[in-house]
Amino acid sequence: MGLWDWAVAAYGAPGVSDACLALQDNHEQNVPLLLWSAWAAATGRRPDEETLEAACDTARAWDGVVLTPLRAMRRILKAPVPDIDDGPRETIRNRVKALELEAERHLLQALEALAPDPSAPPRPAIDGLAATARIWAAVTPRPALIRLADALPA
């Protein structure tokens, strides 16, 4: 199964979206990057440190230029705005949300292209999540990563 299909299925599992959003909002983690890490672990892929750094660089570029601005706009448009009718505001918000999802899909495609071929048995998701989170940020939010790993489907 490709990364996009795996990520959509995983994100829909109970508890995964909440765990992902907590990592994003409370620990400034990149959800597509985390899902890539968990997918790599689940499919027996072992990205080396250089690949992890390249994945983080790719995610940072998408995050800074595309995802964060789209997410900010979507969140601004969530609440009613004086002098803007709710219908058009919601229409624009839904379009921004669709663009954000499309951008995440493009990021996942770029990350999948960086992943090495499967070379080993699957390993626990927490191993891949922690390895990537260590490169992504100065602080590794281990309890939140464990929560995500525990929620991911086996």
Regions found by a protein language model. Name each.
Residues M1-L3, A149-A154:
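Short, low-complexity, intrinsically disordered N-terminal peptides in bacterial proteins
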Residues L3-Q24:
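Short amphipathic alpha-helical segments and their helix-coil junctions
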Residues D18-R60:
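N-terminal interaction modules that seed assembly of large macromolecular complexes
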Residues E28-P32, A40-R45, D63, E100-E104, ...:
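Short alpha-helix boundary/capping elements
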Residues A72-M73:
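Long, amphipathic alpha-helical stalk/connector segments used for oligomerization, subunit docking
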